[in-house]
Each structure stands twice: as C-alpha cells, then as structure tokens.
Regions:
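Metal-dependent phosphoester/phosphodiester hydrolase catalytic core
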Residues: 18-426
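C-terminal outer-membrane/trafficking sorting elements
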Residues: 430-515
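Selective for proline/serine-rich intrinsically disordered segments
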Residues: 12, 61, 67, 140, ...
Length: 515
C-alpha cells in the first residue's frame, strides 16, 4: 500500500507543478531582455522561465525567483541574454518541474538594435477582455501593445491593496481572447483614471499607494522613477517612447508634478540628442479646448510645456492619446498651444480608443480623419502604428481600426503617414553595457563619446554623403564621457567612424545649417 501511495505521488506531483502557473504576461521588451509576471496557485521559491528561439536547440533560463503571498503569489521574472530581432517562445519551470503541457507557454519577438522597422498596436478604455477586438489586434502581429490607460473599469480606490489587485487577476489576465493576446504580445502600459483609483481620480485619492503596489506586483514594466507614479520610457528602433502618468500627481492646479515635468523634458532632450523620434504618450487628450478632464483644464501649463519644447528645438515628436472613446488623427496643425502660435514644429496626434466601450468626444480638432467615436458599446476600436526606417528617413503610419461585436469584420477607419529625418542615426547598439564604446551627435557641441575603460587613444573619421573625407583625427582618449568638437559643416548627411582599440562605432548624423 505504501508503494502504491508513493507511485501515485510521483504521477500527481508533476501534473500539479504544470498547472501551478495560473496567469501570466510579459512586458518591458528590449533587444536583449524581457520581463514576465506569472501568478502561481501556491507559494514557491523556485520558479523560472525557459525560452528559446528557432530551432530551439538550446534554452535560455532566467534566475530562480519567488512567488510569495505578500505579492499575491506573483513572481517577477526577468529574462536576459536574448538575441535582437528573434522570435522566442517561453515556458515555466516550477519546483524543478518543467511545464511541457503547452498550457502556460508564451511568445514574443525581440526588436533589433538601431534603425529598424516594426509595428505596434495601441488603445485605451477596455470594457471587456472577452471582446473580439483583442483577437483583431493579435491578427495584426504587433511587436507590442502600448496601453494608454483604463485597462479595466473596476474603479478601485482603497487603502487595502486587494481591490486593486483583483482587476488584474480577474479582468485583465483571465478572460479570452485578451489573455491569449497577452500571452503572445508584450505590453507597455500606463494607467488612466478607471484603472488607477476611479473616474476622475488624481493625487488626492486615498487608494493611490495601493494602486501603485498592485501595479508593481502585477505589471511587467520599465524602470520607475517615483514610489507612486508609473511614468516610464523605453526605446525601440529609433523611436523613444515616453509614457506620462497624468493621474497620480494630478491636482487642481497642475497635470503633472514638477519632478515628472523635469523627467519629461530630460527624456525629450535624450531623444533630440540621440537621433530619435519621441513618441509621447499622454493618456488625456492634448488638443482639446474647454474640457475639464484633459489638458484643456490646465491651458497655462500646456502652453508653458509647448513653449519649452519649441525653445529646446525638440522637433521630432508624435503624440498618442487615449481616454476619449474615439479614433482621430491630426497632422500637428492643431497641436500648437505655444504662446507665439507660430506652428514651429508639427506634432502629429493619434487618438486611439475605445478598445471596448461606447463612444465619446472630449474635444480637439483633427484634420487627417475623425472624429470617429465607437458607434456602440459592442464596437471595438484600436490604433496600429507602422514604423518604417531605412536608416535615414523614418516614416510612421497611423491606422485606426474598428471591429464589430462578434469579430466578423475589422475595417480601416482612418490612416495617415508622415516622415521625419532625426538629427542623428545610430548604427549599432544604442544602449551598450557600461564600458563599451558609445558615440552620439550633440549638435553644435560636436561628437560625444563614452570611452571604454583602459582605452589609450581614439581615431575619428568623418565622410560626407558622397564619401568624401571631411575629417580624420587621432587623439588621446579621456576617461568616461569626452567631447570631440567638429569643424563647421555644411548642412547634410555625414558618417562618423570611431575606433578605440579593438572597438568600432559607426553613426550617421545630419548637420543643419545653423552650425
């Protein structure tokens, strides 16, 4: 009898381990890493992810981590050492037993380094994870989902964390086809009001600390900069995504705190100085007038921000907004709220919502298609953004899609394409590890280098668009960050080749006529 009991345990235990992952999703995607959150049916200190790329001859394993009741049994897993531009599948190992059932098996594709083409889907205001809009988005085969808020409509506002956890557990990660979409598509996500602390919620709401805790437990996210707020940034290809949190520090006097505003401007300057187009995610509508629940409620703050961006020469921006339940596109002609109103730069706007909710209009003028509110609560709407990058011009297409309530049709509602030529084009790794060679174009200052440890000298060679040698210099290498001034250059495209010992970095940059 004892032998029979032992045999039964050997049969039952592996099945129990295979079923121990109850929900999961991925996010914080980069060329070499991804974060995964997995909720287990019980506590363990031995859970990890195993991933492979075709032909799957060897697997990459994450470090072991824990699923603890203090974090609602959610394990925070980071998978590193991935290859850029590769499709991966992953599965879980719990307590030494690998899940071979396929029930808990996810997938993602890493982006490439440097100039790269890709696509993503975007939207806000998700009324139901059972809506066919989730399958329609999956059919677009996006690199990731950019969620601009209201991922659920539970409106939690409690000093207790459980009411803020439950919507992730029950509404976001448990319903089909949403959960299958999230198994196959990484997410980048910033909250709005309904998934923060309820309709119209701001910094005064009592549940903000609980919302922050539940978000950090459940959501695979990029690095945070504040104990409560969830503003974050990341770069894919030559697009730098900047996600503003317009709820946790919002007051009757300001949309965002001074600390978040400083962070936002530093991220804009990072994009400007590193040859990137900035994709600014503002969950609330930017270009409305007279509405209390978006940027129209703080016209002075909006004008001041616009003035600073113009003054800093941050010209390559496009804006993605949610909250209003409608599809709409503007080429930037209606996005200028600067004091001078001189339309110095065009900042195109893509208003993409609602994933599954009835329609609404919250202001704004749009000259490239719209406004198109959801015709009914049964209709789903989302945005698709195509990024085409040939290494010089970067062209972006906004496609607005609408589905019916049964998934029979998914039709194109509006579309708009624009192109930009950022001031610098990186070829190779934009974010190498500390100690590696990195170079970027700093405008009138010249070229900036991060010099590898122990380097003795550097050789700089610059050619113009015809291949004519413009500059060749050799100089002693300083430690850390060093500046290499350039001679006055005619406006045009240039290629810089920098050698430092055995390392080489190549970048292309555009010198403007003001140098």
């Amino acid at each position: 009898m004892r032998l029979l009991h032992t045999a039964l345990l050997l049969i039952v235990l592996p099945c129990s381990a295979q079923e121990s992952v109850t929900s999961y999703w991925s996010g914080a995607l980069s060329p070499t890493s991804i974060h995964i959150r997995a909720r287990l049916s019980g506590p363990t200190d031995s859970v990890r992810v195993l991933a492979c790329a075709p032909p799957c001859t060897e697997e990459i394993a994450s470090p072991y981590t824990v699923a603890d009741p203090s974090a609602d049994l959610v394990a925070a897993i980071e998978l590193t050492g991935l290859q850029p531009g590769m499709p991966y599948t992953y599965r879980f190992e719990v307590n030494g037993v690998q899940d071979a059932s396929g029930i808990a098996a996810g997938s993602f594709t890493t982006p490439g380094f440097g100039a790269a083409s890709f696509s993503f889907v975007t939207g806000s205001c998700n009324g139901s994870g059972s809506h066919p809009v989730w399958q329609a988005m999956r059919d677009k085969d996006p690199l990731f989902l950019l969620s601009t808020g209201d991922l659920h409509y539970r409106d939690p506002n409690s000093v207790e964390v459980e009411p803020h956890r439950e919507p992730y557990r029950e509404d976001v990660l448990s319903l089909s086809p949403m959960k299958e979409f999230l198994h196959a598509t990484p997410i980048a996500y910033v909250w709005d009001d309904h998934d923060f602390c309820g309709n119209g919620s701001d910094a005064s709401f009592i549940g903000k600390a609980s919302a922050a805790r539940a978000y950090r437990e459940y959501v695979p996210h990029y690095p945070m900069h504040h104990p409560i707020s969830v503003y974050q940034s990341f770069t894919i290809g030559r697009v730098h995504f900047i996600l503003s949190d317009l709820r946790s520090t919002k007051t009757g006097e300001e949309m965002m705190s001074g600390a978040q505003l400083s962070w936002l401007l530093s991220e804009m300057l990072y994009a400007r100085d590193n040859g990137l187009v900035a994709a600014w995610v503002t969950s609330l509508t930017w270009n409305s007038v007279g509405y209390p629940e978006n940027w129209a409620c703080q016209p002075a703050e909006r004008s001041a921000l616009n003035d600073v961006l113009f003054a800093l020469g941050v010209k390559d921006i496009f804006i993605i907004a949610g909250d209003a339940h409608m599809l709409a596109i503007d080429d930037g002609a209606n996005a200028d709220f600067s004091t001078a109103q001189d339309l110095r730069y065009h900042y195109p706007i893509f208003q993409a919502a609602a994933l599954a909710r009835w329609g609404s209009y919250k202001g704004g003028q749009f000259n490239q298609g719209g406004v198109f509110p959801n015709p009914s609560a049964a209709h789903g709407q989302f945005g698709e953004v195509l990024v085409e990058d040939n290494g010089f011009d970067l062209c972006i297409t906004f496609n607005g899609w609408q589905t019916d309530g049964v998934g029979a049709e998914c039709g194109l509602v509006n579309s708009y394409t624009f192109c930009r030529t950022p001031g610098q084009i990186l070829v190779g790794m934009p974010h190498p590890a500390n100690g590696d060679l990195l170079c970027w174009y700093a405008g009138e200052q010249g070229l900036m280098f991060r010099v590898p440890d122990g380097a003795a000298s550097m050789e700089v060679e610059i050619t113009d668009a015809t291949g004519r040698l413009v500059l060749r210099e050799r100089r002693a290498a300083d430690h850390g960050i060093m500046l290499h001034p350039l001679p006055r250059l005619s406006a045009g495209l240039y290629t810089a080749s920098i050698r430092c010992g055995s390392e080489r970095s190549v970048l292309r940059f555009v010198a403007d006529s003001h140098r």
